[in-house]
Curated annotation (Swiss-Prot):
The record marks A88, G89 as: Cleavage. The keyword Kinase does not apply. Residues 28-48 bind DNA. The active site is at S123, K160. This is LexA repressor. It comes from the Bacteria. PANTHER family: LEXA REPRESSOR, LEXA REPRESSOR-RELATED. GO terms for molecular function: DNA binding; serine-type endopeptidase activity. It comes from Pseudomonas chlororaphis (Pseudomonas aureofaciens). Its EC number is 3.4.21.88. The keyword DNA-binding applies. It catalyses: Hydrolysis of Ala-|-Gly bond in repressor LexA. Represses a number of genes involved in the response to DNA damage (SOS response), including recA and lexA. In the presence of single-stranded DNA, RecA interacts with LexA causing an autocatalytic cleavage which disrupts the DNA-binding part of LexA, leading to derepression of the SOS regulon and eventually DNA repair. GO terms for biological process: DNA repair; DNA replication; negative regulation of DNA-templated transcription; proteolysis; SOS response.
């Protein structure tokens, strides 16, 4: 890693603190506020300089897409990050950013929850998943028929009940007003992002 300026070292230290304290990196806006920059754009320029020097790695288009090579945050057993927005109706493009954290032990859920997803829509209301709820999600790529999954179709994410027969998958709503989403695995991409392991209402 190339030598950092004092300002760059300060930003890197703040990123490490966020990773240690929260388990996830800060946004550009949070960096700007902490370091007294006038706008997130100024923070972005410093982050690009840190990336060029090999101090961090950046994921384009992600508000918290900052990684420090070789740095592993200590697992936090007292909270879970609230990530993005997931449609519980017609799928929408999910915003993959962490809104805040929720003070709850991941081990409260079984299997252990990895994050919370904020639900928008009423397509799963008949099993008690309502608009605004936080869905506890266990990360896995595998799902069995009948399980409630977080599924990604292309760049869109939705919460539905999973059913598969051969190369066809149905993502089924728990609300008669919503038709099932049919996916042919031969010509459509479908990724299981995780399983629902609980719901939090605040």
């Amino acid at each position: 890693m190339l030598k950092l300026t004092p300002r760059q070292a300060e930003i890197l230290a703040f990123i490490k603190r966020c990773l240690e304290d929260n388990g996830y990196p800060p946004t550009r806006a949070e960096i700007a506020q902490e370091l007294g920059f006038k706008s997130p754009n100024a923070a972005e320029e410093h982050l690009k300089a840190l990336a060029r020097k090999g101090a961090i790695e950046m994921t384009p288009g992600a508000s918290r897409g900052i990684r420090i090579p070789g740095f592993e945050a200590k697992p936090d057993d007292s909270s879970l990050p609230i990530i993005g927005r997931v449609a519980a109706g017609a799928p929408i493009l999910a915003e993959q950013h962490i809104e805040e954290s929720c003070n709850i032990n991941p081990a409260f859920f079984h299997p252990r929850a990895d994050y919370l997803l904020r639900v928008h829509g009423m397509s799963m209301k008949d099993i008690g998943i309502f608009d605004g709820d936080l869905l506890a999600v266990h990360t896995t790529r595998e799902a069995r028929n009948g399980q409630v999954v977080v599924a990604r179709i292309g760049d869109e994410v939705t919460v539905k009940r999973f059913k598969r027969e051969g190369s066809k998958v149905w993502l089924i709503a728990e609300n008669p007003e919503f038709a099932p989403i049919e996916v042919n695995l031969k010509d459509q991409d479908l990724v299981i992002e995780g399983l629902s392991v609980g719901v939090i209402r605040r």
